């Protein structure tokens, strides 16, 4: 079986990022990621809008309280996906067809195995985590029901994320966008039908989510099986190659551990939030949904720099990889500044999309106005961490982020809860952690750079 890398931009959608204008390459790659993630967040947000307006405040709090648990498991898998994407981008940049084919098939085989594990883990551990967060008794039954349904079908999300990650690693961020649009539209329609027409409540939102995720998984796997390049998925070639698996885990495990443990630490943060009651919980949920929208441009640029650095280092172009990192940081900071002002100005209007409860609205607006000015710090976190991962160094970002987002934040919350115990002081644990992380990553990047001690 032979494949060719004869064109800079392949008819299949793959894009070599080793030549051409750097800013243009990053933006062209990041834009489909941004639009796709906007659609993904749109249907997640519609879940909350539908539940908050057509079910109850308690149901909104129930859905929001599950985010930490869901993100813990998905975060670990996303880290592994990052590891696979870095290896694939290096294979693609160096034009190593054989290694690329092997990595793709090892990646999908690993995904199938891990999907079973995460499904079982989610189903069995969810009740424990809900209790650990001190979820209020009036919220607990609906939270538990939502998680049970969600984790029963979470394999679809994992297969889509890994399949889309393969396409993005070879520079194709367009077709994952189309799939996400289909997924978002499907999810929104099913939300409205299940909740408003059939009155299924929180269960209806959960079913809508897993059905749309499985549609996405089927579509992305179908695309990969129809490819003609080295990353074509051939089911009979699925196997777990030991050397490739170790390369993926060397990069992906630290990233996954950092994402999972950071998300898990949010379980404890959520317990501090829960202490202030269901109205505060619902307000925190509305802020969390808007927060994810605001972070999308920054995260999209961060993801683009991982692929950019990976491909250019695979091609042996260190200087271009460094220039790409600097350019990405400038783009991210500029975007954050542009977004900040309208969100702060229209905070009450944006929050009112989720609920008309005055107490919940007040909490939501307070959180938005408190946190938004600190988003520039997140730009440094996202760009430097993703650039280092693209270079095959995911251990340093893991240590720095876990130290900032977990150790520092938990110490801060423990102390502040004893001294002040106000919702403002609790919420400030997030931006203070962002600032510490950005300072440490800035220092590390400028002292060590993109040099990886081990060959990918």
For each feature predicted by the language model, list its residue ranges.
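Transmembrane alpha-helix boundary and packing residues in multipass membrane permease domains
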Residues: 33, 37, 49, 86, ...
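Helix-terminus/linker motif at the lipid-water interface of multi-pass membrane proteins
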Residues: 38, 42-60, 130-137, 193-200, ...
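Small-residue hotspots at the loop-to-helix junctions and early N-terminal turns
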Residues: 57-68, 144-147, 206, 278-293, ...
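Short alpha-helical transmembrane segments in multi-pass integral membrane proteins
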Residues: 1-30, 88-155, 197-253, 309-374, ...
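Transmembrane helical elements of multi-pass membrane transporters/channels
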Residues: 28-47, 149, 160, 183, ...
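Short runs within selected transmembrane alpha-helices of multi-pass transporters and secretion channels
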Residues: 81, 150-168, 176-184, 205-220, ...
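Residue-level signal for short hydrophobic patches within transmembrane helices
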Residues: 19, 23-42, 46, 69-76, ...
């Amino acid at each position: 079986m032979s494949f060719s890398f004869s064109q800079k931009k392949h008819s299949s959608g793959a894009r070599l990022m080793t030549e051409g204008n750097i800013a243009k390459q990053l933006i062209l790659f990041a834009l489909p990621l941004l639009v796709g993630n906007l659609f993904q967040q749109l249907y997640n947000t519609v879940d909350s809008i539908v539940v908050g307006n057509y079910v109850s405040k308690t149901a909104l709090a129930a859905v929001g309280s599950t985010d930490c648990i869901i993100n813990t498991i998905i975060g670990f898998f996303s880290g592994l996906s990052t590891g696979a994407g870095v290896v694939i981008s290096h294979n693609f940049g160096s034009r190593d067809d054989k290694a690329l084919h092997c990595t793709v098939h090892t990646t999908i085989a690993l995904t199938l195995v891990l999907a079973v594990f995460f499904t079982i883990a989610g189903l069995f551990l969810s009740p424990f985590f809900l209790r650990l967060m001190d979820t209020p008794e009036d919220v607990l039954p609906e939270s538990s029901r939502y998680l049970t349904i969600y984790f029963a079908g979470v394999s679809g999300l994992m297969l889509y994320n890994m399949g889309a990650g393969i396409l993005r690693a070879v520079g194709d961020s367009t077709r994952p966008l189309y799939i996400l649009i289909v997924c978002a539209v499907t999810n929104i329609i099913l939300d409205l039908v299940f909740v408003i027409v059939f009155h299924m409540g929180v269960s209806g939102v959960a079913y809508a989510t897993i059905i749309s995720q499985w549609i996405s998984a089927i579509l992305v796997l179908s695309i990969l099986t129809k490819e003609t390049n080295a990353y074509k998925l051939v089911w009979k070639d699925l196997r777990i190659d030991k050397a490739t698996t170790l390369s993926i885990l060397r990069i992906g495990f630290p990233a996954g551990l950092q994402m999972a443990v950071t998300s898990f630490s949010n379980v404890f943060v959520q317990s501090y939030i829960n202490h202030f009651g269901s109205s505060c919980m619902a307000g925190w949920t509305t802020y969390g949904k808007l927060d994810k929208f605001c972070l999308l441009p920054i995260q999209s640029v961060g993801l683009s720099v991982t692929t950019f650095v990976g491909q250019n280092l695979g091609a042996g172009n260190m200087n271009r990889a460094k220039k790409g990192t600097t350019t990405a940081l400038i783009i991210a900071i500029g975007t954050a500044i542009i977004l900040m002002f309208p969100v702060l100005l229209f905070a009450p209007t944006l929050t009112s999309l989720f609920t008309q409860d005055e107490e919940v609205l007040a909490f939501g607006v307070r959180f938005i106005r408190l946190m938004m000015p600190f988003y520039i710090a997140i730009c440094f976190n996202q760009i430097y961490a993703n650039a280092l991962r693209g270079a095959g160094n995911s251990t340093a970002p893991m240590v720095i982020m876990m130290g900032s987002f977990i150790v520092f934040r938990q110490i801060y919350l423990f102390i502040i809860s004893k001294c002040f115990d106000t919702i403002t002081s609790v919420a400030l644990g997030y931006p203070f952690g962002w600032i510490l992380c950005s300072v440490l990553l800035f220092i590390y990047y400028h002292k060590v750079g993109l040099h990886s001690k081990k060959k990918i």
